[in-house]
A protein has these predicted regions:
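Short aromatic/hydrophobic "clamp" motif used to bind/position activated sugar donors
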Residues: 88
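Conserved nucleotide-sugar donor-binding catalytic segment
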Residues: 7, 120, 139-229
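A conserved acidic beta->alpha catalytic loop
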Residues: 24, 31, 39-48, 69, ...
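N-proximal low-complexity "stem/linker" segments adjacent to membrane-targeting elements
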Residues: 1-24
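Glycine-rich, basic loop-to-helix element that forms the pyrophosphate-binding segment
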Residues: 65-83
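C-terminal subregions of glycosyltransferases and related glycan-biosynthesis enzymes
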Residues: 202-335
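Acidic helix N-cap motif at the loop->helix transition within catalytic regions
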Residues: 16-19, 44-52, 96, 100
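Conserved donor NDP-sugar-binding/catalytic core segment of glycosyltransferases
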Residues: 100-132
Length: 335
């Protein structure tokens, strides 16, 4: 019998954490699942351990990525193509599902045949479930597209359950992007008018930890990833223009992304690159002259002021970004 839900986990050299994730899938009260583990090139015994588990439970499948392309989103796309179910959930190799997760998500999608995906609340932990109070409520009020563009993400990769057909129609994950690929998927879906539901019920746990080898950290340090981030922002702009259309709230959200990347260049000690990035808001007619000049001043303070200047610049930039985020009159921002 074919499974009803496919869980897809990309992994690389995280055997201990991966085993905990697989355990959380095997503890589901809902039985009609398959768990596809896509290995991005592990050399820590992952292949042998997952093969042992798969021999004991055929619902677990191990796939080793082939070809030159690598990365979590390449692995996720492999999992989507190989999935046998009509519904898909993404589970990172260090995260955990509540025992009721798949059953409740399956029931929601059965009751709502017209939706492309549904999202659920996230609870964070560091070492053990319950050691953090942080959570991400998927039932937040507001414009989800704007929230993603401001990096106030209303949900993360594990939160949705997708129809496989909808992911295929969306074009899967963009493997050409170096930065923000999962955000790109969600922005693309919202801008394209995909139908979805949000539920506040927490049904999974995401590990909150700092790992210097993670891509999210590399994005803050690598010029290559910062250049890639600009390409991603310009894709976001195209999605908005081709989908719901641009308005001044979305314009300032896009401006905030350019400033985010400009600040990362300052942190790398490259003020000229930061100023070139920030100039994009004028070249692309997204931000006003006032907004541009004030941003230039903050970047210069952060870059040239030494440690005291960086601290002052960071405090000023924080207040300035809050002003840009909350301002109700568009004139000083977009004209």
């Amino acid at each position: 019998m074919n499974p009803s839900v496919t869980v897809i986990t990309p992994t690389k050299n995280r055997l201990k954490l991966l085993c905990e994730s697989i355990d959380s899938v095997q503890r589901q009260s809902f039985d009609a699942w398959e768990h596809i583990v896509v290995d991005d090139g592990s050399d820590d015994g992952t292949a042998e351990e997952v093969a042992r588990r798969a021999a004991a439970d055929p619902r677990i499948r191990y796939i080793r990525r082939g070809g030159e392309k690598s990365g979590a989103n390449v692995c996720r796309n492999i999992g989507i193509r190989e999935s046998q179910a009509n519904l898909v959930v993404f589970l990172d190799s260090d995260d955990l599902l509540e025992p009721h997760c798949l059953g409740r998500r399956f029931a929601v999608m059965q009751r709502n045949a017209d939706v492309d995906f549904a999202t659920f609340g996230t609870k964070f932990f560091r070492r053990a479930i319950g050691d953090l109070e942080d959570r991400l409520d998927s039932d937040l009020i507001g414009d989800d597209l704007v929230r993603f563009l401001f990096f106030e993400c209303p949900w993360i990769i594990t939160a949705p359950i997708w129809r496989k057909a909808s992911l295929v129609r969306l074009g899967l994950f963009d493997e050409s992007l170096l930065s923000w690929q999962d955000i790109d998927l969600h922005v693309r879906a919202i801008a394209a008018g995909f139908r979805y539901l949000r539920f506040p019920k927490m049904d999974h746990h995401v590990r909150w930890q700092f790992e210097p080898t993670k891509v999210s950290v590399e994005q803050r340090r690598s010029p290559r990833h910062l250049d890639g981030a600009i390409a991603t922002i310009q894709k976001f702009e195209r999605y908005v223009m081709e989908g719901p259309g641009i308005n001044w709230v979305r314009q300032r959200a896009l401006c905030s992304l350019y400033f985010f990347v400009a600040e990362r260049w300052v942190a790398l000690g490259n003020l000229p690159a930061a100023l070139r990035v920030w100039q994009q808001i004028r070249q692309r007619r997204l931000g006003s002259r006032v907004l541009h000049v004030s941003g230039v001043g903050l970047l210069i303070i952060q870059a040239l002021g030494g440690v005291p200047g960086r601290r002052l610049g960071n405090r000023m930039a924080h207040k300035w970004k809050g002003w840009m985020r909350m301002r109700t009159n568009p004139e000083l921002v977009v004209r």
